[in-house]
């Protein structure tokens, strides 16, 4: 979360009044290293960085967004990035396992080093400024979702795993 807010603030002079950074999700009260709600609210910037909290339905958020950003230190396979691909959004995320499975840097988004707000800001800025690249990456995200995350492919891969286990036994 901090890298997202820091990146937005690094871009503030160039883009305030032109874009809005929207942060969705609850504060993790169990995570002692996480941001508390009060601290998070103190970091927001009116009409520029907004926190909308937990959203039961993310589809409207994705469809209203031009870019999806997920700075993470570690992930499984992020559902949020699969959903972003499915709705055809370009993605900026960190170069960590899980996120790498959803983003091919330079194809449907950018992978940046974890904990690097400057690199995150640079990648977001590139996509804000380049409408054609944003649209191209969005189309490519949708193609990636259809190719890699379709139910047919997932079922086929699961079946293949079971087949290989049966052969080994």
Identify the role of each PLM range.
Residues 119, 126, 133-148, 154-160:
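A short, well-ordered alpha-helix in the C-terminal region of glycosyltransferases
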Residues 68-69, 84:
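A short hydrophobic beta-strand element within the catalytic core of glycosyltransferases
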Residues 54, 73:
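Aromatic "clamp/platform" in nucleotide-sugar-dependent glycosyltransferases that forms part
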Residues 59, 66, 88:
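A short alpha->beta transition loop at the rim of the catalytic pocket in nucleotide-sugar-dependent
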Residues 25, 34-53:
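Nucleotide-activated donor-binding/catalytic signature segment of Leloir-type glycosyltransferases, i.e.
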Residues 90-93, 103:
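Short hydrophobic beta-strand element within catalytic cores of glycosyltransferases
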Residues 1-10, 118-119:
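A conserved mid-protein helix/loop that constitutes part of the nucleotide-sugar donor-binding site
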Residues 105-106, 110-117, 126-131:
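Conserved acidic donor-binding segment of nucleotide-sugar-dependent glycosyltransferases
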